[in-house]
């Protein structure tokens, strides 16, 4: 073995690249199984038709979403294609309004306003229901998104982004689906909804 021979170093570099490429492919395939819709951490879009809760799992040592029985969003059950279209539109609304300039999603974004990763599960929506006169959490969220200035409860005010009823409903669908994603306990110390008897 001659360490001065460039062939030795070239062969070493090529074999290292090949081995690491195989490792990268294996890790990518493993990750896709966890992060794809319907994977181990990311539910199917139709989860918006179900009750979503957030409970501490002692075995894992963190909080995780718990998917329960039927609880259709806006009282209407949507099929897989309808749920995907609604969630895609909600994500587009969030991206087009640059919500990440003030909020965070999965820890990415600005920390000026609340993290929206588990926004659907936020116990504060019960207060917003009373303020907006809404009968349901989703109705309160829609009213808030359409007129955050009038419906504020804190000193900081979210600007009115001109969100329509349809856009607000799609955004709420996206936020409900997002709350069902298993984020391994992120965000930490997130509050819990009051369990219904």
Where are these regions (language model features)?
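N-terminal positive-inside, membrane-proximal cytosolic segments immediately preceding the first
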Residues: 1-14
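Perimembrane helix-loop junctions in membrane proteins
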Residues: 31-41
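Short cysteine clusters
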Residues: 99-102
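Post-kinase regulatory C-tail/linker adjacent to protein kinase catalytic domains
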Residues: 189-197
């Amino acid at each position: 073995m001659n360490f001065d021979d460039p062939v030795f170093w070239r062969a070493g570099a090529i074999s290292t690249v090949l081995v690491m490429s195989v490792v990268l492919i294996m890790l990518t395939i493993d990750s896709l199984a966890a992060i794809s819709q319907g994977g181990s951490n990311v539910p199917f879009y139709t989860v918006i038709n179900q009750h979503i809760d957030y409970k501490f799992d002692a075995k894992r040592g963190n909080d995780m979403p718990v998917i329960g029985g039927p609880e259709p969003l806006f009282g209407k059950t949507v099929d897989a294609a309808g749920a995907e279209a609604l969630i895609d539109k909600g994500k587009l609304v969030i991206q087009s309004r640059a919500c990440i300039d003030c909020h965070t999603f999965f820890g990415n974004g600005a920390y000026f306003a609340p993290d929206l990763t588990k926004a659907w599960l936020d116990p504060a929506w019960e207060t917003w229901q009373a303020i907006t006169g809404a009968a349901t959490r989703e109705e309160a969220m829609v009213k808030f998104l359409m007129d955050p200035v009038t419906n504020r409860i804190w000193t900081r005010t979210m600007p009115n982004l001109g969100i329509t009823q349809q856009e607000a409903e799609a955004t709420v669908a996206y936020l409900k689906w997002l709350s069902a994603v298993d984020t391994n306990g992120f965000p930490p110390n997130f509050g819990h909804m009051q369990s219904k008897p």
